[in-house]
UniProtKB/Swiss-Prot annotation, chain A:
It is a multi-pass membrane protein. Keywords: Cytoplasm, Membrane, Nucleus, Transmembrane, Transmembrane helix. Belongs to the Integrator subunit 5 family. The keyword Chloroplast does not apply. InterPro entries: INTS5, INTS5_C, INTS5_N. Component of the integrator complex, a multiprotein complex that terminates RNA polymerase II (Pol II) transcription in the promoter-proximal region of genes. The integrator complex provides a quality checkpoint during transcription elongation by driving premature transcription termination of transcripts that are unfavorably configured for transcriptional elongation: the complex terminates transcription by (1) catalyzing dephosphorylation of the C-terminal domain (CTD) of Pol II subunit Polr2A/Rbp1 and Spt5, and (2) degrading the exiting nascent RNA transcript via endonuclease activity. This is Integrator complex subunit 5. Residues 571-583 have a biased composition (Basic and acidic residues). Residues 559-586 are annotated as: Disordered.
From Swiss-Prot, chain B:
Disulfide bonds: none annotated. This is Integrator complex subunit 8. It comes from Drosophila melanogaster. The gene is IntS8. The WFEF motif is required for the recruitment of protein phosphatase 2A (PP2A) to transcription pause-release checkpoint. A motif (WFEF motif) lies at residues 19-24. It is found in: Nucleus; Chromosome. One of its GO terms (biological process) is snRNA processing. The keyword Nucleus applies. The lineage of its organism: Eukaryota, Metazoa, Ecdysozoa, Arthropoda, Hexapoda. Coiled coil: none annotated. Belongs to the Integrator subunit 8 family. Belongs to the multiprotein complex Integrator, at least composed of IntS1, IntS2, IntS3, IntS4, omd/IntS5, IntS6, defl/IntS7, IntS8, IntS9, IntS10, IntS11, IntS12, asun/IntS13, IntS14 and IntS15. The core complex associates with protein phosphatase 2A subunits mts/PP2A and Pp2A-29B, to form the Integrator-PP2A (INTAC) complex. It comes from the Eukaryota.
Length: 994, 1007
């Protein structure tokens, strides 16, 4: 019964189907489909027909899909769904269109739930069907993606694909193989239209498919090297989007074979792969990725060895130019590739060809302002670091390539340019001096680009970094001795700046521009300098304070003879404990010092503060102050040579500023003098006065008692006679031998002053020296009263004695004052302005000599302070031409006189002379060259006898010692003038005859 | 009188002999003198004897009992203290001289004869005897006896010798007969001594007169002394010279010539037979010596020299071993004298040669100094003086020598100074001063001469010096270093250190590095790469000639595209582009295009010189090619392009003045002239605008006036130029040309006018302002915008002030429609722009301060003000002038400081006002400082107004801050601030404090 029924149904089915060709509506009736599905279960014999029917259904659906031809040709997306949703006809035919869905659902459930044998069957059928349909209805060639999009919109195709997919999951290993076989067979048959299916389905067993595709490609390639591999490439390209790992694995596998060819086919592997890359960027990318991953030095050898084999392939031989551009198409690892090539370039010409070609192309593209994938690669963070590293390479090719790449990317990304400059500046080129070449070329920029970024922001960037570095101390612990980034940067900037000076060395950077750029950065440089130097200055001060404290303590214990050994011992103990820390500090300071030297060198090299640059006043002030601070810091350098070198640096610096700007000179000189007198006097032999700390006041001493000790009143702080503190004994006085200024440092200091004062363009300009002179008056003299030039009546010195003694005391405290006066004495008439100081010295000496008279039996020691002071004062007067000859020789003989006589001489010859001849510039004659000079040889300038005779008479009484001087001072000149006098020997003869 | 320091009388030693004992025992004197150390000494005896016998004519009143007192005192009287001797001559009262002794010598004196009493005579004899014991050594006498005593001795000598009382000085017409008591020989001796003393006294005249005067008794003696000293010396000289010339034998006293009186025996006078005869040589030597001294004293140096020589020869003539009785010349003294006269037999010292050379126009000075470098005898300071003197005399033209001499002397001094460790006169400027001369060789030469003679310690000094030299000599240091190495002074460590330091000075030479390559390395042999390299070179080269060569080379490679398209970024301005494109395809086309494109590229990179040179080459190339009619046109266009580039360069490098501004201005005028003349071809608008702005910056206004205003971008420059010209015409604070004002104002409209003119909005204004360079143009623009700001802000507290301000209208129609914000921003920008070109313009600094203050940025405002003040006074070297800081600015600064919480600073600033506004002062002082840079007591040293200090003292007292109060009080007590000081001092002290305060501010705000 059932059977009959079945047969009837079958008959009906066959009829319907055979007639149905003309009328799709009939075929797609759901009843019929159900019937067919029923057969599938009940009549296995009809399976073929049923499947045929299903195929028919699918075809109808496809036809329906294709017919309106409403697909967008580019994307493959049918326009219908979107735009023509309301199309009536479409709606009408919807059941037909959807008919295959029923089949699909049914078959799918069969696959899922039915016996496993269904799967291969259905899979094979579906594949066949899909292949057939695809081949039949593909009107024109589309890319794989487009095909996929196009076909998958079709419900039948989509259903079939889903089916195949479901089946594949159920397959066993051998079945799978078979399926793949079928698929590939299909692919062979319809290589043009089947590719999208392979690509689409390949995802199910990607590796296998990929491998097979490759194998199949290679076979075709071996057969005919001119063959087109679009499909293969297409499939691979498509699959790569999801299955790059498998592709890579496949490549890896193939390359392994390719590099070690066993089969004849293997020889073609490399050429084949390379050819394939021409078809697709993604494949290329993958291949490169693989290559870069597995690349080793050995492999390179292999490549070189095998290359002739590959080259025998004609296609490959001809494709080199295209290969050369390959790198431009890389999204990643492009830079790595190029650098790898560059590393080998020295060895292999082909690498150079490759490099040169690639780079040339690259630069051309940049000039044309075209965008390309490699740019993205270059802009990667990692690539940047890699390139920076390569810039430091010793391999010139590598370095060059890195620089060129950086230049290329900089044209589009200025920030990378700045970062690169900043980075390269921070590196040390002590080991590889070549490295600086990269920096220089980079600074040269990419020629031909109109809007290539300038390098100034790069400098600013690095300086900003360093400022932070210097300000926030040592963020990371660094092993001692390693050059810091700040150090490197400045040393590199220095090299650059020095190179520009020697013109011919660096054609890439215009000296002027570099200079300008660095000068623009001056505020930043100064900030760093400020930080560095100020820390060093603090260090000096601290050291000095400690040293004085030690010295004072020692002296005091010597004075009071009650050494507290215990206390000392404790002190030393502390010392040793502190040492490691101090070492670190020392080390830091040494680094800082080196940095300071470098910065000053740089400032000199870029001629900071010269007349040609426009500077704001605060900057001028800052530069000037820092220069002076640096000078004093330089004085604390360890060796003579370094001290001298540091000083010379600061001279150049000082001189440039001071001759450019008056205000700079003012500041420099003031700072120099102030610091020498008040802050860093200890460097220049200042008498050290230790400030007792309050805590040492004995506790039992009540405040009221202390108050009794110190007289109160307006002038209590002005008393000179502080030789000690009541209750604490005399002020410890250092032995006189230590009172001298260290000669070397003194000389350095004087040169610094001279550098500020000297005007190279107007050599006889004494403005600077006069300024020093006035400064000394301001700083040494106690107040503004009596600071005029004239010498008053000697009587009047009583009024000024107190301030005179304070001034004298200043000279005792700071011996360097003498030297400063000595310097300005040589530049007449500058010393005139210090008249008040000379007056004070003269007055105090005079008084002291007079005072000695009381105690006349006490002999005057040759090196007595008073005698030295008198001598120096006389020398100063002589040097500055404030007193004329023969008084100028007074300093030579003064020590032969007794105190009363000295007092007399000082008053009669010196004081009175100066009183009548006011030390003022008016004394001097200015010649055409602007030189101030007093011609003391002329008759006019002869000293009136009242100033000389006292000396002459005194000398006459000491002829036995002063005979020669007498002759030289008085007689020689006289006789020379009255030249007519006869030979004395003639007279002698007459006497003889008598 | 009760001086605790005065030594108390010491009890007499046992053996001390009292003076009267000698009167009693005539032998006592001989015995006494023969002792090894007689007490009292011979000199003391003389003094005592003389003080016992004052002038015979003298009248003095002795107090009763003074004799006794005298007896007690005199022995202790060890020195010539006349005050004590004062009461002595009690026995010599007139009555006594008349009555007591009458010890007249048997030889009857003439009526004027010796009218002495016995005691006087006895004492005189004793006195002369002692003097004879001392051999009449005038030196010794002079040294130990007061002048008055010497005169007395001399008088006594004469008196006794002539046998009659004489007064010193001897009268002019002195012709005393020798009385019976006298003796001719003795008289001659005495006269000789007299004349010698007369001359000698001249030498100590001053001193003698100043010597402490005897209090009362010796009044007359002093007068006598004066007379004696004033006696003319010529007769004495003549006398002594005669004496020298005469051959008459000369006798001197023997100790036994004088016979002391005995109490019992009247005696028969002196024993003049016992006298020494001395050789004339001895006499002459002594006399010549004295004469020489006298001549020296009176500056008759020639005579002195003769006398000294005579003295010496005479002394030499005396046979050695002879005992000299009369001549007391010590060899050292003689030598001194001879040396003083310059006739010493000793070899001339270096110093002497040196002095000689100075007098002889510096002959041989170099060799002397060279010698001295080794011997180091001449004081260094003298050498330095000579160096400077040579410089002076060469400079004034007195000395006809080359600078070479100066250089050599200086070099030798520098070398000498090496060993003057720490001399304060060392030459520190040698290298700078003589940097244009070849200053190193003389130095090295001098050094090499020195080197073998250096001690170890000196080598250290030498090292320091060499280091210094090396560091000085930038370029030549290598060579010097080689020389120095040759000296072998330095250890290897030191050499390394030096090398390290020198490294800094030498330019680095990059070898084998990228920087030394002219292009990228290209080893590839492929032709494509070659072509690529050529193209790259074409792109990067900066030289027209290279371009030409490369173009030829490239042409040969049969390129696929036109050569001018090699670099797409080459671009050519429009009129030229059409011209070039119209050319036939040729070398010239490529060449022109490439050069123009490259020039433009170079100009944008700031390489103006190469750009201009390229265009110049192109211009001449075009002229050479003689290409039809377009040559003229082309050249003209290129010239304008050149001008354009040069204007850009000039504006960019304004302060370096790269070009001849005059000619540039001329060319700008020409260029604008083309527009004016209505030529068929006019320059590009860009170029026209640049020209106009350039002329504005060159302050050449008239040519701008005649231009067509309609040309859009020219509008602003023209309006500015017109304003300037009107300002010149008006010469006064009159409102002028409103054109510029209106134009400027329109830029700040909230809603820019549409289409009214080609100019619109802030951006075009900025574009114009950006290219302003001249100070006055800046000033004008700033004042204009400043005025707009003032009107719009309408807040007199925050008014800006500047020059030119009064030129502009005082009101604006409908101010609401203008944007104050953009005015502020533009002004801020313009000020910083202007200050970046002229950072020392005080009025702008102040204005910026005003603006900052108006915005509320107090700190930056203060910075600007302080900057202005510091700049205006050259860091406080010049007094603060009114144009730098007037009351207006100071008040604003006070406001700033107060706003910043620095009330003390504000207080100090109040003193800067013309009239201190105590209201503000007290208000500020009572505020508590809220800024760590400010404190009440930090600025006491900057206050000069005493009222202010008083207030502070009071304030501290109120607050109970004792120590601060004391400090303030001590400030008030300084002499400088005394209200009674004269104006100058007051001004000075205020000035000092002002600058001190300003410097403090500068350190706080500017550093």
């Amino acid at each position: 019964m059932l059977r009959q029924n079945l047969l009837d149904q079958l008959k009906h089915f066959i009829e319907t189907v055979s007639n149905g060709h003309s009328c799709p509506q009939l075929l797609t009736s759901p009843n019929l489909i159900k019937l067919a599905l029923g057969f599938l279960e009940e009549l296995p014999a009809t399976r073929d027909i049923v499947f045929e029917y299903f195929a028919l259904l699918a075809e109808i659906s496809v036809q329906l899909y294709v017919s309106p031809e409403m697909a967008d040709p580019k994307t493959g997306m049918p326009v219908s769904q979107v735009k023509l949703a309301g199309n009536r006809q479409q709606q009408q035919r919807a059941p037909e269109y959807e008919a295959f869905n029923l089949v699909k659902t049914a078959l799918q459930s069969l696959v899922w739930k039915g016996p496993p044998a269904w799967s291969p069957l259905i899979a094979n059928w579906s594949l066949e069907l899909v292949a057939k349909l695809s081949d039949k209805y593909t009107q024109r060639r589309m890319t794989i993606t487009a095909s996929c999009n196009y076909w998958l919109e079709c419900s039948a195709m989509h259903g079939l694909m889903t089916l195949i997919n479901s089946c594949f999951r159920k397959l066993t290993q051998p079945e799978e193989e078979a399926c793949v076989e079928i698929m590939l067979n299909a692919f062979h048959r319809f290589p043009m239209t089947f590719d999208w299916i392979v690509a689409r389905l390949g995802g199910c067993f990607p590796y296998k498919i990929i491998m097979q595709i490759l194998q199949c490609g290679i076979k075709r390639f071996v057969d005919d090297y001119r063959c087109h591999l679009d499909s293969e490439a297409g499939i691979l390209d498509y699959m790569t989007s999801c299955h790059e790992q498998h592709l890579r694995a496949a490549f890896r596998e193939m390359l392994r074979e390719g590099f070690a060819p066993k089969k004849p086919l293997d020889v073609a592997v490399v050429p084949f792969l390379l050819i394939t890359t021409n078809y697709s960027d993604t494949i290329l990318q993958s291949l490169v990725n693989v290559l870069v991953e597995i690349y080793t030095e050995d492999m390179c050898e292999v490549i070189v060895q095998k290359a002739p084999l590959w080259l025998s392939n004609k296609m490959f031989a001809g494709m080199q130019p295209t290969l050369n551009n390959a790198v431009l198409r890389l999204n990643e690892r492009g830079a790595t590739l190029l650098l790898t090539a560059a590393k080998m370039a020295e060895k292999y010409v082909w690498c150079q060809d490759f490099l040169d070609n690639s780079m040339q192309e690259l630069e051309q593209w940049v000039l044309n302002q075209r965008n390309f994938p490699l740019l993205a690669d270059l802009a990667y963070e990692e690539t940047k670091y890699m390139l920076w590293k390569s810039c430091l390479s010793t391999n010139l090719f590598e370095q060059q390539t890195a620089v060129r790449l950086l230049l290329v990317v900089s044209s589009q990304h200025p920030n990378i340019y700045y970062q690169t400059i900043s980075q390269l500046l921070k590196k040390s080129y002590a080991q590889n001096p070549n490295g600086i070449g990269a920096l220089i070329r980079l600074l040269g920029g990419q020629s031909g680009m109109v809007n290539f970024p300038g390098f100034t922001p790069g400098f600013k960037m690095v300086l900003e970094d360093i400022t932070l570095d210097v300000q926030v101390n040592n963020r990371l612990p660094v092993p001692p001795g390693t050059p810091t980034e700040a150090f490197n940067t400045f040393s590199n900037l220095n090299i650059l700046a020095r190179m520009h000076k020697s013109k011919n060395v660096a054609p890439y950077i215009k000296a002027q521009h570099l200079n300008q750029a660095l000068n623009e950065c001056l505020p930043k440089i100064l900030q760093i300098f400020d930080c560095t130097v100020n820390k060093l200055v603090l260090r000096i001060d601290r050291d000095a304070a400690e040293r004085i404290a030690d010295k004072f303590r020692a002296q005091q214990s010597k004075n009071s003879n009650n050494n507290n050994e215990l206390c000392n011992g404790k002190d030393y103990g502390k010392r040793t404990k502190l040492e490691p820390g101090e070492d670190k500090v020392d080390d830091e300071d040494a680094t800082r010092m080196r940095l300071a030297h470098l910065i000053v060198d740089l400032l000199n090299n870029i001629e900071a503060g010269s007349r040609t640059t426009v500077l704001r006043t605060p900057l001028v002030l800052k530069l000037a102050t820092l220069s002076v601070k640096y000078f004093f810091v330089g004085l604390t350098e360890k060796t003579v040579i370094r001290r001298a070198a540091a000083s010379h640096r600061s001279y150049t610096l000082l001189q440039r500023q001071c001759s450019a700007r008056k205000i700079a000179r003012t500041v420099c000189l003031r700072e120099l003098v102030e610091r020498a007198l008040f802050y860093h006097g200890h460097l220049l032999g200042q008498l050290e006065v230790y400030q007792l700390d309050e805590l040492e006041i004995p506790e039992h001493e009540h405040l009221i008692l202390q108050n009794l000790h110190t007289s109160s009143g307006a002038n209590s702080n002005r008393s000179v006679l502080h030789s000690g503190i009541i209750g604490r004994g005399l002020r410890p006085v250092l032995p006189p031998s230590e009172r001298n200024c260290d000669a070397e440092k003194q000389a350095l200091y004087l040169k610094a002053l001279n550098a500020c004062c000297a005007d190279l363009e107007k050599p006889n300009n004494v403005e600077g020296y006069s300024l020093v002179s006035l400064l000394l008056v301001e700083l040494v003299s106690t107040d503004v009263m009596y600071n005029g030039l004239p010498f008053p009546d000697e009587e009047f010195t009583r009024v000024t004695m107190e301030r005179d003694m304070l001034i004298r005391r200043a000279f005792i405290n700071s011996p360097v004052l003498w030297a400063v006066l000595g310097l300005i004495a040589g530049h007449r008439p500058a010393l005139c302005y210090s008249s008040v100081l000379l007056r004070a010295l003269c007055a105090t000496c005079l008084h002291h000599w007079r005072g000695k008279n009381v105690n006349r039996f006490q002999p005057t020691a040759a090196n007595d302070e008073l005698m030295l002071c008198t001598k120096k004062m006389l020398q100063l007067l002589a040097m500055s031409q404030l007193i004329p000859p023969p008084l100028t020789n007074l300093h030579l003989i003064i020590e032969h006189f007794e105190s009363a006589e000295i007092a007399l001489l000082l008053r009669e010859c010196i004081w009175n002379y100066l009183k009548d001849h006011v030390p003022s510039p008016a004394l001097f004659h200015v010649d055409n060259n602007g030189l101030h000079w007093r011609n003391t040889n002329t008759q006019l300038a002869k000293v009136p006898p009242q100033y000389v005779d006292p000396l002459r008479h005194l000398m006459q009484r000491k002829l036995s010692t002063l005979g020669p001087h007498y002759h030289q001072m008085f007689i020689m000149g006289e006789l020379m003038e009255g030249d007519s006098e006869p030979d004395p020997t003639a007279r002698l003869q007459i006497v003889e005859i008598d | 009188m009760d001086d605790p320091l005065k030594p108390k009388p010491v009890p007499l030693a046992a053996e001390t002999v009292l003076w009267f004992e000698f009167l009693l025992d005539p032998h006592k004197i001989t015995q006494h003198l023969q002792r090894p150390h007689p007490e009292p000494s011979a000199m003391e005896l003389i003094v005592q004897f003389i003080s016992m016998t004052p002038n015979t004519a003298q009248e003095s009143v002795g107090t009763p009992g003074s004799d006794l007192q005298n007896l007690n005192q005199t022995p202790s009287n060890s020195g010539p203290i006349p005050g004590v001797v004062g009461g002595a001559p009690a026995p010599t009262t007139p009555t006594a001289s008349g009555g007591v002794g009458m010890p007249h010598s048997p030889q009857r004196p003439a009526e004027k004869g010796l009218q002495l009493n016995r005691k006087q005579l006895a004492l005189k004899i004793l006195e002369l005897k002692v003097a004879t014991w001392l051999k009449w050594d005038l030196d010794a006498l002079e040294k130990n006896l007061p002048v008055i005593m010497q005169l007395a001795l001399l008088r006594d000598l004469c008196t006794i010798s002539y046998g009659c009382s004489l007064s010193i000085p001897l009268p002019n017409d002195f012709d005393a007969r020798i009385s019976a008591a006298g003796n001719e020989r003795a008289a001659r001796f005495a006269l000789t001594i007299y004349h010698r003393m007369l001359l000698r006294m001249q030498l100590i005249k001053e001193q003698a007169l100043k010597a402490p005067r005897p209090q009362n008794t010796m009044y007359q003696t002093v007068d006598q002394l004066q007379q004696f000293l004033d006696t003319p010396t010529q007769p004495s000289i003549e006398y002594l010279q005669q004496l020298c010339a005469s051959t008459k034998p000369f006798y001197i006293f023997h100790y036994d010539s004088f016979v002391p009186l005995r109490c019992d025996d009247i005696g028969n006078g002196q024993n003049y037979d016992v006298m020494h005869l001395i050789t004339p040589q001895e006499l002459r030597a002594q006399l010549h010596y004295e004469l020489a001294q006298y001549y020296l004293y009176t500056k008759q140096y020639v005579l002195a020299r003769e006398a000294a020589a005579a003295c010496n020869t005479n002394l030499q003539a005396i046979p050695p071993q002879t005992t000299l009785y009369y001549c007391h010349i010590r060899p050292s003294e003689l030598e001194g004298l001879l040396q003083a006269c310059g006739i010493s037999a000793e070899e001339q010292s270096l110093l002497e040669k040196f002095q000689q050379s100075l007098l002889n126009n510096y002959t041989d000075i170099v060799s002397i100094l060279r010698m001295d470098n080794r011997r180091r005898e001449i004081p260094f300071i003298s050498r330095r003086q000579v160096e400077l003197d040579i410089e002076g005399s060469i400079s004034t033209g007195i000395l006809k020598e080359t600078v070479q001499l100066q250089l050599q002397v200086a070099a030798l001094n520098v070398v000498r100074n090496i060993f003057e460790w720490g001399s304060i006169f060392g030459s520190v400027e040698y290298f700078e001063k003589y940097r244009e001369l070849d200053c190193l060789p003389p130095l090295v030469e001098a050094l090499q001469e020195m080197l073998p003679h250096c001690t170890f310690k000196e080598q250290a000094a030498l090292k320091h010096f060499l280091i210094d030299c090396l560091l000085h000599q930038g370029g030549q240091s290598r060579q010097l270093l080689q020389t120095v190495r040759g000296f072998g002074l330095f250890s290897s460590d030191e050499l390394q250190d030096i090398d390290e330091q020198m490294l800094q000075a030498t330019p680095p030479v990059p070898t084998n590095s990228l920087a030394s390559l002219s292009d990228w390395m290209c080893h590839s042999k492929m032709s494509r790469v070659d072509v690529g390299a050529l193209e790259r070179q074409l792109i990067s080269c900066t030289n027209a000639n290279t371009v030409r060569i490369l173009l030829v080379k490239l042409c040969a490679t049969a390129p696929g595209k036109p050569l001018w398209a090699i670099n797409p970024s080459w671009d050519v301005p429009q009129p030229l582009k059409t011209l070039i494109m119209a050319m036939p395809v040729s070398f010239l086309q490529d060449f022109s295009y490439v050069l123009l494109g490259k020039a433009r590229e170079l100009a944008t990179r700031g390489n103006y010189i190469d750009a201009v040179s390229m265009l110049s080459v192109l211009k001449s190339e075009n002229q050479r090619q003689e290409m039809a009619a377009n040559v003229q046109l082309m050249c003209k266009l290129i010239t304008w392009e050149i001008l354009h580039i040069q204007i850009t360069q000039c504006l960019e490098e304004w302060h370096q003045k790269p070009l001849d501004l005059q000619s540039l201005g001329g060319r700008c005028k020409q260029c604008l002239g083309a527009l004016q003349a209505g030529d068929s071809i006019v320059p590009r608008p860009d170029i026209l605008e640049s020209c106009a702005i350039m002329l504005l910056n060159l302050t050449e206004f008239p040519p701008l006036l005649y231009l067509d205003k309609r040309a859009g971008p020219l509008e602003l420059p023209l309006a500015f130029a017109a304003t300037f010209i009107e300002m010149e015409k008006m010469k006064g604070p009159k409102k002028v040309c409103r054109d510029a004002w209106e134009l400027m104002l329109s830029m700040f409209l909230n809603v820019p006018k549409r289409g009214s003119s080609g100019v619109g909005g802030i951006s075009s204004l900025q574009a114009f302002l950006q290219r302003i360079r001249h100070q006055s143009v800046f000033g004008l623009a700033i004042s204009m915008i400043g005025k707009v700001h003032n009107i719009l802000k309408d807040d007199p507290n925050h008014d800006l002030s500047c020059e030119y301000m009064q030129l502009w209208p005082t009101s604006i129609n409908n101010p609401v429609s203008y944007s104050l914000r953009s005015v502020c921003e533009t002004l801020q920008w313009l000020l910083s722009e202007a200050l970046s070109y002229y950072p020392q313009t005080i009025s702008w600094l102040k204005m910026k301060g005003d603006l900052d203050l108006a915005i509320g940025n107090n700190e930056s405002a203060m910075r600007c003000y302080v900057n202005a003040l510091v700049t205006g006074t050259d860091y406080c070297t010049m007094p603060l002038q009114r144009n730098v800081a007037d009351d207006y600015v100071i008040r604003k600064m006070i406001r700033c400081a107060a706003n910043l919480g620095c009330h003390m600073q504000a207080t100090v600033l109040c003193q800067f006002l013309d009239e201190i506004d105590y209201g503000i002062v007290f208000k500020n002082l009572s505020e508590k400082s809220s800024n760590f840079t400010d404190a009440m007591d930090a600025y006491y040293s900057c206050i000069w107004d005493t009222t202010l200090l008083e207030f502070i003292v009071n304030l501290h007292a109120k607050r109970g801050e004792h120590s601060r109060k004391l400090e303030a009080i001590s400030m008030m007590g300084t002499l400088e601030l005394n209200a009674n000081n004269n104006e100058e001092i007051k001004r000075e002290s205020a000035m000092v404090r002002k600058s001190r305060f300003l410097r403090a501010l500068a350190k706080q705000y500017l550093l």
